[in-house]
Amino acid sequence: MGLRFSRGRRRGGMVSLISVISTIGIALGVAVLIVGLSAMNGFERELNNRILAVVPHGEIEAVNQPWTNWQEALDNVQKVPGIAAAAPYINFTGLVESGANLRAIQVKGVNPQQEQHLSALPSFVQGDAWRNFKAGEQQIIIGKGVADALKVKQGDWVSIMIPNSNPEHKLMQPKRVRLHIAGILQLSGQLDHSFAMIPLADAQQYLDMGSSVSG
């Protein structure tokens, strides 16, 4: 309609120039708006899929660590309306080593079966490695960025140094544990460069926590 209007009337040079500039300006504005909305929609989708889907909606931790009577609290949480899933976990910091390469990482001990109901993390582990992820096998899943920094791949072995303390909370020589890389986690984000997972039962054993957890 606008094209017919512009062709159907004879105008002066200045009026025609203004009309052309206005048309181009409107077209550019609409194009920028479309691109901006597309970028926002893509960002929202990635935010939901790669960040919010892998981060728990809430975490509960005891003031005095480790948490020994967590089972009662877990039972109460699971009874709250709207809670889809809940599970215990252990968080600790370690230093992973492969040859001359070192990397500080945040390690999370999780229950492999329950984690599938809690977050989308298992779906970002390459291949079908999560199916074989279980306690008692000296396994660890590390982020893609950590693997690249250490120059390792799935199937390789790494050493992880874990903080060690006695009952009086005095620091001792770090405990060194040899672990097999069971899988690579690739979220294409910052988490890939500082995160690793091990089975919950193994974390309890390495940290001498018995049946206690962090949260």
Task: Report residues per predicted region.
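N-terminal Sec/SRP start-transfer signal
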Residues: 1-29
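Hydrophobic C-terminal alpha-helix "anchor/cap" residues
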Residues: 6, 51, 77-78
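Residue-level recognition of specific faces of alpha-helices
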Residues: 16-23, 39, 50, 106
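Short, flexible turn/loop "capping" segments at secondary-structure junctions
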Residues: 26-27, 51-54, 99, 208-211
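Alpha-helical transmembrane segments
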Residues: 29-40
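Membrane-interface junction motifs in transport/secretion proteins
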Residues: 39, 44-74
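A short beta-strand structural signal in non-transmembrane regions
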Residues: 58-62, 146-147, 212-215
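A structural signal for hydrophobic secondary-structure junctions
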Residues: 75-197, 201-211
